[in-house]
Curated annotation (Swiss-Prot):
Belongs to the NTAQ1 family. This is Protein N-terminal glutamine amidohydrolase. The active site is at C20, H74, D90. Keywords: Hydrolase. It catalyses: N-terminal L-glutaminyl-[protein] + H2O = N-terminal L-glutamyl-[protein] + NH4(+). The gene is tun. Monomer. Its EC number is 3.5.1.122. GO terms for molecular function: protein-N-terminal asparagine amidohydrolase activity; protein-N-terminal glutamine amidohydrolase activity. The keyword Transmembrane helix does not apply. It is an enzyme of class 3 (hydrolase). Mediates the side-chain deamidation of N-terminal glutamine residues to glutamate, an important step in N-end rule pathway of protein degradation. Conversion of the resulting N-terminal glutamine to glutamate renders the protein susceptible to arginylation, polyubiquitination and degradation as specified by the N-end rule. Does not act on substrates with internal or C-terminal glutamine and does not act on non-glutamine residues in any position. GO terms for cellular component: cytosol; nucleus.
Protein backbone atom coordinates (compact mmCIF):
# COMPACT_ATOMS: atom_id res chain seq x y z
CA UNK A 1 0.00 0.00 0.00
CA UNK A 2 1.26 3.44 -0.84
CA UNK A 3 0.84 6.60 1.20
CA UNK A 4 -1.19 9.56 0.08
CA UNK A 5 -2.49 11.96 2.66
CA UNK A 6 -5.42 13.41 0.75
CA UNK A 7 -7.60 11.22 2.95
CA UNK A 8 -6.27 10.05 6.34
CA UNK A 9 -8.04 6.68 6.17
CA UNK A 10 -10.98 5.06 4.43
CA UNK A 11 -13.09 5.10 7.60
CA UNK A 12 -13.00 8.91 7.53
CA UNK A 13 -14.58 9.08 4.06
CA UNK A 14 -18.27 9.52 3.33
CA UNK A 15 -19.63 6.24 1.98
CA UNK A 16 -23.04 4.83 1.12
CA UNK A 17 -23.29 1.52 -0.74
CA UNK A 18 -24.52 1.77 -4.37
CA UNK A 19 -24.08 5.55 -4.50
CA UNK A 20 -20.52 5.57 -5.87
CA UNK A 21 -21.07 8.78 -7.87
CA UNK A 22 -21.96 10.65 -4.67
CA UNK A 23 -19.18 8.99 -2.66
CA UNK A 24 -16.65 10.30 -5.19
CA UNK A 25 -18.28 13.76 -5.23
CA UNK A 26 -17.79 13.83 -1.45
CA UNK A 27 -14.11 12.89 -1.87
CA UNK A 28 -13.69 15.79 -4.31
CA UNK A 29 -15.45 18.08 -1.85
CA UNK A 30 -13.15 16.92 0.94
CA UNK A 31 -10.04 17.72 -1.12
CA UNK A 32 -11.41 21.17 -1.98
CA UNK A 33 -11.99 21.82 1.71
CA UNK A 34 -8.79 20.36 3.19
CA UNK A 35 -6.22 20.29 0.34
CA UNK A 36 -7.42 22.84 -2.25
CA UNK A 37 -3.97 23.09 -3.81
CA UNK A 38 -4.32 19.44 -4.92
CA UNK A 39 -7.78 19.73 -6.50
CA UNK A 40 -6.35 20.41 -9.97
CA UNK A 41 -4.61 17.01 -9.93
CA UNK A 42 -7.73 15.05 -8.96
CA UNK A 43 -10.37 13.37 -11.13
CA UNK A 44 -13.69 11.57 -10.94
CA UNK A 45 -13.66 8.56 -13.27
CA UNK A 46 -16.85 6.90 -14.54
CA UNK A 47 -16.62 3.38 -16.01
CA UNK A 48 -19.39 2.09 -18.28
CA UNK A 49 -20.25 1.23 -21.89
CA UNK A 50 -23.16 1.46 -24.31
CA UNK A 51 -24.93 -1.58 -22.86
CA UNK A 52 -24.07 -0.65 -19.28
CA UNK A 53 -22.55 -4.06 -18.56
CA UNK A 54 -18.99 -3.69 -17.28
CA UNK A 55 -17.14 -6.50 -15.47
CA UNK A 56 -14.87 -5.44 -12.62
CA UNK A 57 -12.72 -7.66 -10.42
CA UNK A 58 -11.61 -7.20 -6.80
CA UNK A 59 -14.90 -5.61 -5.77
CA UNK A 60 -16.47 -5.98 -2.32
CA UNK A 61 -19.77 -6.88 -3.96
CA UNK A 62 -18.09 -9.46 -6.20
CA UNK A 63 -18.37 -13.22 -6.04
CA UNK A 64 -15.87 -16.05 -6.14
CA UNK A 65 -12.15 -15.98 -5.54
CA UNK A 66 -11.70 -13.17 -8.08
CA UNK A 67 -14.50 -11.06 -6.56
CA UNK A 68 -15.90 -10.23 -9.98
CA UNK A 69 -19.10 -8.26 -10.46
CA UNK A 70 -20.88 -6.76 -13.46
CA UNK A 71 -21.98 -3.18 -12.84
CA UNK A 72 -24.02 -0.88 -15.05
CA UNK A 73 -21.44 1.76 -14.14
CA UNK A 74 -18.87 2.48 -11.47
CA UNK A 75 -17.09 5.61 -10.25
CA UNK A 76 -13.72 6.03 -8.55
CA UNK A 77 -11.45 8.90 -7.53
CA UNK A 78 -8.00 9.43 -9.03
CA UNK A 79 -5.06 11.58 -7.89
CA UNK A 80 -2.37 12.30 -10.49
CA UNK A 81 0.07 14.75 -8.86
CA UNK A 82 3.02 13.99 -11.18
CA UNK A 83 3.79 12.05 -14.41
CA UNK A 84 5.10 9.03 -12.50
CA UNK A 85 2.57 9.03 -9.68
CA UNK A 86 -1.10 8.23 -10.15
CA UNK A 87 -3.23 6.80 -7.36
CA UNK A 88 -6.74 5.37 -7.32
CA UNK A 89 -9.11 5.71 -4.39
CA UNK A 90 -11.98 3.24 -4.80
CA UNK A 91 -14.30 2.86 -1.83
CA UNK A 92 -15.75 -0.39 -3.24
CA UNK A 93 -12.57 -2.30 -4.01
CA UNK A 94 -10.90 -4.98 -1.91
CA UNK A 95 -7.53 -3.53 -2.96
CA UNK A 96 -5.74 -1.09 -0.63
CA UNK A 97 -6.96 2.50 -0.30
CA UNK A 98 -5.27 4.03 -2.22
CA UNK A 99 -3.74 1.74 -4.85
CA UNK A 100 -1.20 2.65 -7.51
CA UNK A 101 -2.85 3.16 -10.90
CA UNK A 102 -1.11 0.26 -12.68
CA UNK A 103 -1.95 -2.27 -9.97
CA UNK A 104 -5.55 -1.05 -9.75
CA UNK A 105 -6.17 -1.20 -13.50
CA UNK A 106 -4.42 -4.56 -13.91
CA UNK A 107 -6.39 -6.24 -11.13
CA UNK A 108 -9.73 -4.46 -11.54
CA UNK A 109 -10.12 -4.34 -15.33
CA UNK A 110 -7.58 -6.93 -16.49
CA UNK A 111 -7.83 -6.85 -20.29
CA UNK A 112 -10.54 -6.31 -22.89
CA UNK A 113 -8.94 -8.96 -25.13
CA UNK A 114 -10.67 -11.84 -23.36
CA UNK A 115 -14.05 -10.09 -23.23
CA UNK A 116 -16.84 -9.80 -25.74
CA UNK A 117 -17.05 -6.34 -27.33
CA UNK A 118 -20.26 -5.56 -25.46
CA UNK A 119 -18.34 -5.88 -22.20
CA UNK A 120 -15.43 -3.62 -23.12
CA UNK A 121 -14.92 -0.83 -20.58
CA UNK A 122 -14.82 2.89 -21.35
CA UNK A 123 -13.78 5.67 -19.02
CA UNK A 124 -15.05 9.22 -18.65
CA UNK A 125 -12.38 11.22 -16.81
CA UNK A 126 -13.64 14.47 -15.28
CA UNK A 127 -11.50 17.06 -13.45
CA UNK A 128 -12.57 17.20 -9.81
CA UNK A 129 -13.41 20.90 -9.90
CA UNK A 130 -15.67 20.34 -12.92
CA UNK A 131 -17.35 17.40 -11.22
CA UNK A 132 -18.12 19.46 -8.13
CA UNK A 133 -19.81 22.14 -10.24
CA UNK A 134 -21.62 20.10 -12.90
CA UNK A 135 -22.70 16.86 -11.22
CA UNK A 136 -26.35 16.78 -10.19
CA UNK A 137 -28.55 13.87 -9.11
CA UNK A 138 -32.00 13.73 -7.59
CA UNK A 139 -31.48 9.97 -7.08
CA UNK A 140 -34.37 8.99 -9.33
CA UNK A 141 -32.33 6.07 -10.71
CA UNK A 142 -32.44 4.45 -7.27
CA UNK A 143 -36.23 4.43 -6.98
CA UNK A 144 -38.61 1.66 -7.99
CA UNK A 145 -41.75 2.48 -10.02
CA UNK A 146 -43.73 2.64 -6.76
CA UNK A 147 -41.32 5.26 -5.38
CA UNK A 148 -39.60 3.00 -2.85
CA UNK A 149 -35.80 2.90 -2.66
CA UNK A 150 -33.81 0.13 -4.32
CA UNK A 151 -31.05 0.90 -1.81
CA UNK A 152 -31.30 3.34 1.11
CA UNK A 153 -30.03 6.80 0.08
CA UNK A 154 -27.43 8.90 1.88
CA UNK A 155 -28.71 10.87 4.88
CA UNK A 156 -27.60 14.20 3.41
CA UNK A 157 -29.72 16.02 0.78
CA UNK A 158 -29.31 15.17 -2.93
CA UNK A 159 -26.39 16.85 -4.70
CA UNK A 160 -27.96 19.33 -7.11
CA UNK A 161 -26.24 21.86 -9.38
CA UNK A 162 -27.61 25.30 -10.15
CA UNK A 163 -28.46 24.37 -13.74
CA UNK A 164 -29.64 20.77 -13.81
CA UNK A 165 -31.80 18.66 -11.52
CA UNK A 166 -30.50 15.30 -12.76
CA UNK A 167 -27.64 14.81 -15.20
CA UNK A 168 -26.18 11.47 -14.06
CA UNK A 169 -26.85 9.98 -17.49
CA UNK A 170 -24.51 12.48 -19.14
CA UNK A 171 -21.66 11.20 -16.95
CA UNK A 172 -22.43 7.52 -17.51
CA UNK A 173 -22.74 8.03 -21.28
CA UNK A 174 -19.54 7.04 -23.07
CA UNK A 175 -20.17 8.88 -26.34
CA UNK A 176 -17.31 11.23 -27.18
CA UNK A 177 -18.39 14.84 -27.43
CA UNK A 178 -21.26 14.45 -24.99
CA UNK A 179 -20.95 15.22 -21.31
CA UNK A 180 -18.03 16.65 -19.32
CA UNK A 181 -14.44 15.47 -19.35
CA UNK A 182 -12.82 13.09 -21.84
CA UNK A 183 -13.78 9.54 -22.83
CA UNK A 184 -11.14 6.81 -23.26
CA UNK A 185 -11.02 3.13 -24.11
CA UNK A 186 -9.16 0.96 -21.60
CA UNK A 187 -5.92 1.11 -23.62
CA UNK A 188 -6.22 4.88 -24.07
CA UNK A 189 -6.92 5.32 -20.36
CA UNK A 190 -3.76 3.41 -19.45
CA UNK A 191 -1.70 5.28 -22.06
CA UNK A 192 -2.78 8.64 -20.68
CA UNK A 193 -2.34 7.98 -16.98
CA UNK A 194 0.34 5.32 -16.61
CA UNK A 195 3.96 6.21 -17.19
CA UNK A 196 6.48 3.46 -16.48
CA UNK A 197 9.67 4.44 -14.60
CA UNK A 198 11.68 4.01 -17.83
CA UNK A 199 9.40 6.36 -19.74
CA UNK A 200 9.64 9.00 -17.02
CA UNK A 201 13.44 8.69 -16.93
CA UNK A 202 13.67 9.17 -20.70
CA UNK A 203 11.32 12.16 -20.56
CA UNK A 204 13.49 13.83 -17.90
CA UNK A 205 16.74 13.47 -19.85
Amino acid sequence: MTTDFLFPKIADCSYVSCYCEENVWKLCEQVKRTRPEELGTCYAVFVSNEGRTVPLWRQKAGRGDDQVVIWDYHVFFMHNPSPNRCLVFDLDTTLPFPTYFHKYVTETFRSDLALRPEHHRFFRVIPADTYLIEFSSDRRHMRRPDGSWIKPPPSYPPILSNTNMHCLGDFICMSAGKGPGAVYSLSEFVHNFYKSPNMVAQHNK
